[in-house]
Every structure is written in C-alpha cells, then in structure tokens.
Amino acid sequence: MKAIVYTTNAGSTEQYAKLLAQKTGLPVYSLAEAKRTLSSGTEIVYLGWIMASTVKGYANAAKRYRICAVCAVGMGQTGTQVDVVRKKNAIPQQIPLFTLQGNFDVEKLHGVYRFMMQMMVKFAGKGLSEKTDRTPEEDDMLDMMLHGGNRVCIENLQAVLDWYKNC
C-alpha cells in the first residue's frame, strides 16, 4: 500500500483519513490531490462518506487506483451496514470494507446534501422518536439526528489498523 485517499463532505472522512495516516505512516491525499500526485494503478486505502448507502468517490477511485481496502463513513455505528454498502457500491468481496461512524452536523453539509439530510432528519427522526421498541443503535441514530454528534475517534479505526498490520 502506498497511500490513503479520501473524499469528504463535512470533514469526518478527512479526520479519519488523517488519523489513519498518523497510525500507519502512509501519506494522505484528497481524491483531487491524489489525481495530481499518484500514478494510475497505485495501491491505496480509500475512505469515502456514505450517502444513501453509496460511498462517495469510490467509483472514481476504483477506476484509477488499486483499492486494497475501503472505509465508508456515515451516521450508522461502526461495523454496521457492511453488506448493504458492499452491494450498493459493487465492492468486490476480496476487498476489506469497514464502516465507521462519523460526526453529524446538518450545518456543515453543503448544497443539496444539507437539504436532503434536513428532510431525512424530519421524517426518519419523527418515525424513530415514535417507535417504542428502539434498539440501542436506533437510540444512537435518533440522538445524532436531534442533537448532532461527534463520533470520530481512533477506537473506531481499530479493525482497520488490525487489518493493516496483517496485510
């Protein structure tokens, strides 16, 4: 592996990319920087943010680089939604996929994504708040929707770091 490449919208993915770079010693680039710096076919770890189960930037990165692992950052708890994200993005089974819980602040989102998330919070939040048998994961999601949240932490990267040590 030669580098860490990421796409971010509100900053969580960039935070994870930089934490991972600190722990691995690999250089870190935004996808735009990587296109100017890295050769086509370079082995990378790709980090992207999740929107409707789609890992933003993954398709472009996969066309250009040899992706050794994918880290998808979203609102769900770390380690959840792996099967859905893998299927939606057609990530091959042999490529490790890690989901990481990021931060959530509607005000940090840009453009249409802010509007979409405001609507999601309004409707999904209402449905979750009315649900009487919420799981702990649903309680956490509701809390993030209603109050925002900072969930980026090195502990969420442990499975990624374990994989990296063994590859």
Regions from the PLM with identified roles:
Residues 119-167:
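Glycine-rich phosphate/pyrophosphate-binding loop and the adjoining helix
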Residues 13, 42-44, 114-119:
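Short, mixed-charge, low-aromatic patches
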